[in-house]
A protein has these predicted regions:
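A short glycine-rich, Lys/Arg-flanked "PGG" loop and its adjoining helix->strand segment in the class I
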Residues: 202-217
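Core SAM-dependent methyltransferase catalytic element
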Residues: 241-259
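N-terminal auxiliary segments of SAM/dcSAM-dependent transferases
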Residues: 1-86
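Conserved SAM/SAH cofactor-binding pocket of Class I
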Residues: 99, 103-188
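Hydrophobic beta-strand segment of the Class I
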Residues: 192-193
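Short strand-turn motif at the edge of the Rossmann-like AdoMet-binding core
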Residues: 221-225
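Conserved beta-strand elements of the Class I
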Residues: 93-94, 127
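Conserved short alpha-helix immediately C-terminal to the canonical SAM/SAH-binding motif I
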Residues: 156-160, 200, 227
Length: 259
């Protein structure tokens, strides 16, 4: 029986200068070091091809791609350069993603926004682990969280998230910290959002469990239908029970309660 063939696509922007070819070689070399098992491909099927797309510039390209997006029932994510027609009951989040992850376009971000809209109870204390642009922390605050601690390992993303928190007028509700783990949090919280990767979630699952109150909710995404089962299998051992699984294309979000 033949195995399915998967195509994995990486997208990025490189300046067109005399070092571009060197940068491309380095990128390909890094991709080539990834184990086939992590990519869920056959070692014999590994093949890297490169396509070129000319853009006017990163800022101009992002402004063409990132537009106002409606997610779920009432969440609207808009960049500063776009307009939105606000409807009664809408929760409008203004995000300039910069170089950080979290424009609202990615499937895993949309899944987390849908889960927040469905499950967040006003007044909760929340943690956004791997906040990126800050979009999920801001969504949690606008949906009624009393306090949100957003943590991020990338210093540049920390600054992007802080700017977006200010853009939405939520400095009194959201604190953004440069940290590597939810173990950074001192007292237990009611909600942890982790839109990162399956590997990072599994590596920090015990710390996430310790950060949550009994009955607290974990919203985990950034995983695909291929590696979500790896996370799901580990949840009971960490003291979680599954509540729901959401999918969007190949992407998955898991909701689980700490017992």
């Amino acid at each position: 029986m033949s195995q399915p063939t998967w195509t994995i696509r990486f997208e990025g922007y490189l300046p067109v200068d005399d070092r571009m070819e060197e940068r491309l070689r380095r990128v390909c070399a890094e991709i080539d070091t990834l184990p086939a098992s992590a990519l869920h491909i056959d070692e014999a099927a590994r093949l890297i091809t490169i396509d070129y797309t000319q853009v006017k510039g990163l800022l101009e390209a992002s402004r063409e791609i990132v537009r106002t997006t409606r997610v779920g029932e009432h969440i609207v994510v808009k960049p500063p350069w776009d307009e939105c027609e606000e409807q009664p009951g809408d929760v409008v989040i203004e995000i300039d993603p910069g170089t950080a992850f979290g424009s609202g376009l990615h499937e895993s971000t949309r899944l987390c926004l849908r889960a927040l809209e469905k499950y967040l109870t006003p007044g909760v204390i929340a943690v956004d682990f791997g906040t990126g642009s800050g979009i999920l922390a801001i969504a949690a605050a606008k949906l009624g969280a009393a306090r949100v601690t957003a943590i991020e390992a990338n210093p540049e993303a920390v600054e992007v998230a802080r700017a977006n928190v200010m853009r939405n007028g939520l400095e009194s509700v959201i604190e953004v910290h440069h940290a590597l783990s939810p173990a950074f949090i001192g007292s237990p919280v009611d909600l942890v959002i982790a839109n990162i990767t399956a590997e990072t979630i599994t590596a920090h699952l015990d710390a996430i469990a310790e950060a949550l109150n009994t009955g607290g909710l974990l919203i985990a995404s950034g995983m695909t239908i291929l590696n979500a089962p790896d996370v799901e299998r580990l949840l009971p051992n960490a003291g979680f029970s599954m509540v729901e699984k959401l999918t969007d294309g190949q992407w998955v979000a898991l909701m689980a309660i700490k017992q």
